[in-house]
Amino acid sequence: MQAYFDQLDRVRYEGSKSSNPLAFRHYNPDELVLGKRMEEHLRFAACYWHTFCWNGADMFGVGAFNRPWQQPGEALALAKRKADVAFEFFHKLHVPFYCFHDVDVSPEGASLKEYINNFAQMVDVLAGKQEESGVKLLWGTANCFTNPRYGAGAATNPDPEVFSWAATQVVTAMEATHKLGGENYVLWGGREGYETLLNTDLRQEREQLGRFMQMVVEHKHKIGFQGTLLIEPKPQEPTKHQYDYDAATVYGFLKQFGLEKEIKLNIEANHATLAGHSFHHEIATAIALGLFGSVDANRGDAQLGWDTDQFPNSVEENALVMYEILKAGGFTTGGLNFDAKVRRQSTDKYDLFYGHIGAMDTMALALKIAARMIEDGELDKRIAQRYSGWNSELGQQILKGQMSLADLAKYAQEHNLSPVHQSGRQEQLENLVNHYLFDK
């Protein structure tokens, strides 16, 4: 079959002096960073949905792209053609992983039976493509938000029959992920929320969602899936308010239903923006709560109130993100999935490469800067100094539960405590970070 991207062999590393827009300037898969190959640190993945499913349509306009697999035709044949192009793209881009929703890779069909049969055929196709290319599945998931049946949610739907249909999709998608050797399974509650409280029973919907997640965990263990289950927080869009608002909110939900040891988080940069947080904040929070799993690497627009899903291009922002990830030991089953799309005006097929190449170079340079920060150790040293009082006898007694509130009040009076505020030195630390970013 003729190559779709016939003007490109493979994207290669040419170094920072290169002016070739179809070459990496910073991402060298084999370069050692802190003793490990860059490819193993970053674990890049390209997503199926934005890259091969979106046709350029938006709220105000029809599809703008001319993709051969999006033309009228037999649905399964078009899905197979899309898979051909997708794996050509993954290979030429040098990404070791990819991600998908069930209906990204397979026609949904007109019934559950058709859905299951179509998906089974496409899983066999994907398995063959993975074996040929060496590209692996980072994670799979089920799209339980696009079809009109999910207008009021999937797990939180007022109709238990819709809940059951969603369960069928998740069972099928998780088993497909398991068969394909996927390293994670993601749950994103696109419509698990509400438009108005006038027709919403918050307690009922929360209980439904909690039970659904418990069943997901049960099924994972039943089929022997060894990957990580991941929830992807998002505050709103398409609903007014979603129940997986941010990392801290999801932690409370998981604790309520006894799932905090079973499910981790897939943090998306643009979702952090929508929640009023920095990407850095959401990553650091997930790590602090013991829930960090994987990343959807993209960016939003602080001046817009919706998910723009642009490619990451801020080394400054992502250096601090990679610093947190490296401090936490790096990825295990997770990775950096580019949940990002070219702009509607970017109609040339090679724009798909430009977007991903820039994003991969951004994250590679961010990784190298973060590694310098780790090796230097100055930021960690400053934080350790700031909290050093908690290593004292008093601090340890408080943390170990050896002193009550009344004990502390007595201690403060007996020792005539008069603590003096110590400077947080924020400006100095910001200058230090700029040193890592901009000084060679």
From Swiss-Prot:
GO terms for molecular function: magnesium ion binding; xylose isomerase activity. It is found in: Cytoplasm. The keyword Transmembrane helix does not apply. Keywords: Carbohydrate metabolism, Cytoplasm, Isomerase, Magnesium, Metal-binding, Xylose metabolism. Its cofactor is Mg(2+). Binds 2 magnesium ions per subunit. Its EC number is 5.3.1.5. GO terms for cellular component: cytoplasm. It catalyses: alpha-D-xylose = alpha-D-xylulofuranose. The active site is at 101, 104. SUPFAM superfamilies: Xylose isomerase-like. GO terms for biological process: D-xylose metabolic process. The keyword Isomerase applies. Disulfide bonds: none annotated. Mg(2+) 1 binds at residues 232, 268, 296, 339. Mg(2+) 2 binds at residues 268, 271, 307, 309. It is an enzyme of class 5 (isomerase). Belongs to the xylose isomerase family. HAMAP family: Xylose_isom_A (MF_00455). This is Xylose isomerase. The lineage of its organism: Bacteria, Pseudomonadati, Pseudomonadota, Gammaproteobacteria, Enterobacterales.
